[in-house]
Amino acid sequence: MKRAITIYITTFLILVVTGGSNCSKKDDNPINYEAGIFPEEIYNLEGINSAYDDYNVSLPQIAGELPLMFSSNRNSQGSQFDIVTGFIFFAFSQYDAGFCIESSMFDNTFYNSLEQKVNTGRDELGPYRLFNGENGFEYFFYAEENALGDLDLKYLTYSPADPYNSLLLAEPVEITALNSSSNDAYICIDNDLTTVYFTNDGDGDFDIVKAMIGDASSLNLWLEGDPAGVSVVDSVNSDFNDKCPFLRNDIMIFTSDRPGGIGGYDLYYSVYRNGKWSTPYNMGPDINTEHNEYRPLIGSCPDFSNHFLIFSSDRPAGLGGYDLYLTGIDLELLAE
């Protein structure tokens, strides 16, 4: 069974990378571009990719730094998925619109501790990070394989004011409000913290489903409470596999193997209009290939005029298995 999840991001503007990086900006060049632009070219994040499968990325907000937590089976040489951490660097030239990006694996005390908290001898997939402004805590969501081989949603929390020490006291907890006897994974939450979306295969194929959240200030009680009323998002699902939703503003991007696509799994997007998600649109040949595109995640940077999309693909240009890729996207254009 192919499994794959989210990204919650806001970063800073022009990242001028030093210390051995080739990404740099000369101070004596005039500013011809007031805002940065993420190019629509597809970039392989080869510094953090491997010969195995790398997908399910999550990116937190850290000014000047962009650590990415994602799922990879590299540590077990392909037998199981763990959460691992990489790092990306990018820079946009305000002089000539040049763009460069570099990536590497990331060794950091906090992220190492977080990996140790969540990784087991089973699969861990779909990391997703969220700051809850109602209670001041950051949430780390993911899916873990249970004893029956199905995926269950879990989470833990820590304080952004003291992330390392508060993480030491945290332990993963099952999300009883959403878990079922089927596979439950790839969670994401809307901007208003009112609706949670995730993937479930209770009807045979994978569907994108949703549930209404109670009071966001007591989110923990809701997550660990009685089963919530879960409903299928009819307007985006098909009779095939629809999974890995990610929301940003009024856009949902997900993956599907429905007929009429370009390859196996393609990336699609839906627009929220008049209280309903639109019929999905294929993201087209600039992103999709005859192979599989998986687990889309949308990010942004202040002072950049567009967003960036990170996704996984097993296209032959990669290092092997599924690799992570980055490209620029215009959400306003998609919403038209």
Whereabouts are the PLM-identified features?
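Bacterial Sec-dependent N-terminal signal peptides
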Residues: 1-31
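Short, conserved micro-motifs composed of acidic
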Residues: 25-336
